[in-house]
Amino acid sequence: MALVLMVVGLGNPGPRYATTRHNAGFMVVDLLADDLGITLDRTREQALTGQGLVGNNRVLLVKPQTYMNNSGQAVAPLARWYGIAPEAILVIHDDLDLAPGRLRLRRGGSSGGHRGLQSIITHLGTTAVPRLKIGIGRPPLGQNVIDYVLKPFSEGDWELIRPVLLEAARAARFLLEGGSMDEAMNRFNH
């Protein structure tokens, strides 16, 4: 029985960042782990990992501990270690270009300026990495982007984001259970 899918949530390690916009990927992996009964309790290749079964498929859940912009330094060695092709990795991350409350699955493509995703693309040597984007919206006029993504969600945004994080975990589970990317995009993109 081989690992068929790696689910990577992007974020920054430590309690200081736990509820920030940039940690939406970590939040989804935590929800997915709870839903699947998987404990992320092993550190390997600079990442917190957990393995489990979904149907007959083994899956690897990953939270890189390298800080966002160096995520590829954890993901690429894990993919090589477990023999997982880039196309079998689902990267979950925040997206400034999607409004809060929006969700978008893509098969691959450019990083769209997301440095954590760009690090993964660079280290894997391909843009053919599926991803699940969580909309966080753009900062208000005059606010620095870095300050914005490293701050916790506002109360108003949290009301929009919480249901989307749950929906993102459902989308990831759908794929882990063997659902097609086309069907997942039709069902979950909004």
Curated annotation (Swiss-Prot):
Which residues does the UniProt site feature Discriminates between blocked and unblocked aminoacyl-tRNA point to? Answer: 12
Protein location: Cytoplasm
User: Might you give the EC number(s) for this enzyme?
Assistant: 3.1.1.29
Q: Where is the active site?
A: 22 (proton acceptor)
* Site note Stabilizes the basic form of H active site to accept a proton, residues: 94
Q: InterPro entries, from UniProt?
A: Pept_tRNA_hydro (IPR001328), Pept_tRNA_hydro_CS (IPR018171), Pept_tRNA_hydro_sf (IPR036416)
Gene Ontology terms: biological process? protein quality control for misfolded or incompletely synthesized proteins; rescue of stalled ribosome
The positions annotated for binding tRNA are 17, 67, 69
Give the catalytic activity: an N-acyl-L-alpha-aminoacyl-tRNA + H2O = an N-acyl-L-amino acid + a tRNA + H(+)
Recorded GO MF terms: peptidyl-tRNA hydrolase activity; tRNA binding
Keywords, in A-Z order: Cytoplasm, Hydrolase, RNA-binding, tRNA-binding
Where does the UniProt entry say this protein principally localizes? cytoplasm
**A cellular component annotation (GO) from this entry:** cytoplasm
UniProt function note = Hydrolyzes ribosome-free peptidyl-tRNAs (with 1 or more amino acids incorporated), which drop off the ribosome during protein synthesis, or as a result of ribosome stalling. Catalyzes the release of premature peptidyl moieties from peptidyl-tRNA molecules trapped in stalled 50S ribosomal subunits, and thus maintains levels of free tRNAs and 50S ribosomes.
Family to which this protein belongs: Belongs to the PTH family.
Q: Summarize subunit and interaction data from the UniProt record for this chain.
A: Monomer.
Q: What is this protein called?
A: Peptidyl-tRNA hydrolase
Q: Which organism is it from?
A: Moorella thermoacetica (strain ATCC 39073 / JCM 9320)
